[in-house]
Amino acid sequence: MAIMPYIRQGTVINALVILFSFWAFLSLIRVIRRRSSTTPLKGPPSESFIFGLRQIIHKSEDSDALYEQWADKYGSVYQVSEPMGSKRVVLCDPKAILHLYSKDTFDFVQTEINRLFLGKYFGRGILWAEGESHRRQRKALTPAFSNVAIRNITPVFFDSAYKTKAAWDATFESNPTKERIIIEVQTWMNHISLDSIGIAGFSHDFGSIQGKPSAVLDVFDSFSNVQPDATTTLMFTLAATFPIMLNIPNNRNALFTKLHQTILEISDELLESTRKEEEGKAGGGRGDAKSIIGSLIKAESANSHLRISQEEVIAQMNVLLLAGYETTSVSLTWALIELSRHPDVQQKLRDELSRFAATDPTWEELTNGLPYLDAVVHEILRLHAPLDETIRVAANDDVIPLGTPLQTASGNIVDRISIGKGTTVSIPTRCMNRLTGLWGDNAKEFVPDRWLNDEKDLLKANEIQGYRHLLTFIDGPRTCLGKGFAIAEFKAVLSVLIRHYTFEFPDGPETKVVGHRSIMERPKVAGQDGAKVPLLVRRVE
């Protein structure tokens, strides 16, 4: 009898070996098929069969520069090694990028691991959806992000900025002998973004600017304090090949689970309260299409041809709350950093805004009447895009045209490449925004003036077909639905802060700023504990 456990153990081991061998065989067949259908491309040598070049990219202080170096050496389209011997095609050719984005959600879809991650932690909303499901959800949300809707909610952005001003002024008044005080600005930008998306999107004031406790803000802040350890990094590296590893407990997964639960509770509460309010109005339950939550309720109506399920409604709220908080706060923080580094630019912007001493710019003026504010904002979006790359998988065999002929690994010169079904293809979006070949020798520098003169100074960047020749909001069917919302908030808040305060680094403009891993990469002053950016702030007389 004592031998039975060993027999059972041996049986389990044999079964695992057989399963792994079967997986390896199927994977080999898929790899052979993909490679036989894909044009052989040049690329940097692999550092490891298990990790490919993932660790090199992950550990690099400037992965965008790494992608650019490889493009210079191997051509505007090349391949890099991925974990477990797989390959990824990298597109740095504008024509090829346009082709991929034009076929997004149908012929090029998200990776399996991305969809599993999004579905698990944020629900089956617009970020998760593909094809017709994505098209339907996007149409349902579009009214909430029209120009009319954004014009109506722009006062919310100004209100958040003035609440922050009131808090800062109170600090000055409690320190009457100090003309300048140190303020950790990133925390305040987080509060502005959270309160703005709460009020403008969901008619809910989180009150974070006034210091009101918020469960969702606590979770957001936790991501900045808990950095991924070696185990977590290994798990995410291999999860693309073994998606089941996404379920392994670790500190980051625990935070995403907590974030999901917290936002879910808030979304349920906000949705229920809005439904009750709408029931008392004429045509109860149909909502106000000018608000995000109103559009969601309208789309949930059984009579709507764009009907979305309650699960999808909650998922949209999860994604919009996260996106509205994270991306804008990062961009605002980077704006204050660059303006602190460049006091001449800061003063030029203040001079342009000086005519609004007694009133605020209208939405129309923010959009078209303040060219230098527009230039500063778009230079920040170019130089410091919140997302670093777009990764897709070919759902079918495809042929991608090239703007610049390319020499393949076999020595042939081609003006298009074949991509086999199942091939992973990526676009290094932040790298493209800074590519010297597109933006000139000063591509890595903060130069708002490049956006003036009808954008004639953009050189070859005009070949990029995305919004304002940037890939910050990507392009095609998945182009960021909330870009108008984000830009209006960015401009409104920045216009208030620059009119009333000056900003500089306590240790001078050469202060080193590094990346800090959070939900998205955030800036932080080197040496700070957490994603902190302390600046010396003075009131403008």
From Swiss-Prot:
Record field: transmembrane: 12-32
Gene3D superfamilies assigned to the protein according to its UniProt record, in alphabetical order: Cytochrome P450
Keywords, sorted A to Z: Heme, Iron, Membrane, Metal-binding, Monooxygenase, Oxidoreductase, Transmembrane, Transmembrane helix
Subcellular location, record wording: Membrane
Cofactor(s) named in the record: heme
Gene Ontology cellular component terms for the protein in this record: membrane
EC number in record: 1.-.-.-
Membrane topology: Single-pass membrane protein
Function: Cytochrome P450 monooxygenase; part of the gene cluster that mediates the biosynthesis of clavilactone A, a meroterpenoid that features a unique benzo-fused ten-membered carbocyclic ring unit with an alpha,beta-epoxy-gamma-lactone moiety, forming an intriguing 10/5/3 tricyclic nested skeleton. Cytochrome P450 monooxygenases claO, claP, claQ, claU, and claW are close orthologs, suggesting that a redundant function or pseudogenes are present in the cla cluster. These monoxygenases are not involved in clavilactone A biosynthesis nor its modification.
A GO molecular-function annotation: oxidoreductase activity, acting on paired donors, with incorporation or reduction of molecular oxygen
SUPFAM superfamilies: Cytochrome P450
Annotated pathway: Secondary metabolite biosynthesis; terpenoid biosynthesis
Family note: Belongs to the cytochrome P450 family.
Gene name tied to this protein: claW
Protein name as it appears in the record: Cytochrome P450 monooxygenase claW
Primary enzyme class: oxidoreductase
Positions of heme binding: C480
Xref: Pfam families: p450 (PF00067)
